[in-house]
Structure formats: structure tokens, C-alpha cells
């Protein structure tokens, strides 16, 4: 590990942000701090993660949502001080790392299947009678 990577890792630890484990296809709610004049408030942005870029301190992700029939995409820096919190609403089952093809789709064609948790098969101990 070189010096730059070490400095970035220390900075990430210093920030102490709680970032949930999410991936492309997941529906994410990002609470963003918005400053309007002298007021500061939190605005929720809920949408599907279409891309994630893992670059240490420079990591980012793109969230896409449909608002009043218009598609809105917003790029967030993962460790930005403007992000108050993040929450994963639902897991999506996708087979691609970048979901840019969703830009060309509308309505039902743009839906993503939900990833269901794997069922655990319980081992039954057979008692000898």
C-alpha cells in the first residue's frame, strides 16, 4: 500500500461515515443536506442505483428516479459532507455493474426484479428409533 492509499484510508476512518452495503439495482434513499439562504434542511432523494464507482475517498454513485414523468439522475460523492444518511429500501437482482440501459426504458420495462434472501435449508437430525 503506497502513501496516497494510506492517507485516503486514514481520512475515510476519520470521517466515520456509516455507509450501507449497496450495489447497482438497489433502491436507495439518500438524505441530502440542502442550504437555502440561511436555512439548512434535509431533502430525501429516492431512486435506483444505476452505477457505483469505488475509488477510495473519490468513490461515487449515480441514483436515478422518475419525478413527475421526468427522469432525474443525480451523482453523489460517497464521502461527501452533504450526505446526511443513506438507507437501502430494496435489493435489486441485476446482472450488470452499470445499468445505463435503463435510460432508454420507460414504464414497466424499466422495472428491476427484487433480490429475495436465500432460503436456508435446516439440517434435520434423524434420531435412531
UniProtKB/Swiss-Prot annotation:
Q: Which family does it belong to?
A: Belongs to the bacterial ribosomal protein bL19 family.
The GO terms this record gives for MF are:
structural constituent of ribosome
Summary of the function given for this chain in its UniProt record: This protein is located at the 30S-50S ribosomal subunit interface and may play a role in the structure and function of the aminoacyl-tRNA binding site.
What does the record give as the organism's lineage? Bacteria, Pseudomonadati, Pseudomonadota, Betaproteobacteria, Nitrosomonadales
Write down the superkingdom of origin: Bacteria
> HAMAP family recorded for this chain?
Ribosomal_bL19 (MF_00402)
Q: What is this protein called?
A: Large ribosomal subunit protein bL19
Q: Which UniProt keywords apply?
A: Ribonucleoprotein, Ribosomal protein
**What GO terms in the biological process aspect are recorded for it?**
translation
PANTHER family per UniProt: LARGE RIBOSOMAL SUBUNIT PROTEIN BL19M, RIBOSOMAL PROTEIN L19
GO annotation, cellular component aspect: cytosolic large ribosomal subunit
